[in-house]
Amino acid sequence: RKIMALFDEYQSRENAKHTLRAMKENARQGFWNGSRPPLGYRVVVAEERGAKLKKKLEIDPIQADKIRLIYKLALFGVDGCGPMGFKAICNHLNDNNVRTRDGGRFGIDAIHKILNRPTYKGEHHFNARDHKTKTKRPEEEHAICAVPAIVTADEFQAVQDSLRLRHASFMSPRFLAPGTLLGG
């Protein structure tokens, strides 16, 4: 029984290795491997290969406008008043009744993920995290899948630079909080 259990365990590991390799190749070819697509995208059937349906991501026009609004708020703010942070964007969207795909309210974590996800500039990273430990994998293990871009690479980079400059490791949080007397 122990020998059979060891053989089954080995076979299971081999199957997992081959499945992951196939999914990485599928992603490199630009196909979606499953799961729920990011906000702003929808899954469409791209082609049929025998009984298998190959799917790709397509921009969902209604949801994509929300993503563009979030990036605009992060760069310019409301009416050009200056860049907004995660919480300010979240509050603005919820106050103006802008909802998620499911009709829920936006949270700070959702805004953080949207502003930091390279999928929106046209490159989805498959296999970016270890599913067991939830840790980031090295960049060379990622399979990059080309998807339609919702924001330009320049807009994405401008948001990343803005977020990095306002990060607490670059600037003290007391200078970021509005209303701090002589804080600037």
Question: PLM features: residue spans?
Answer:
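Conserved catalytic breakage-reunion loop centered on the nucleophilic residue
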Residues: K2-G184
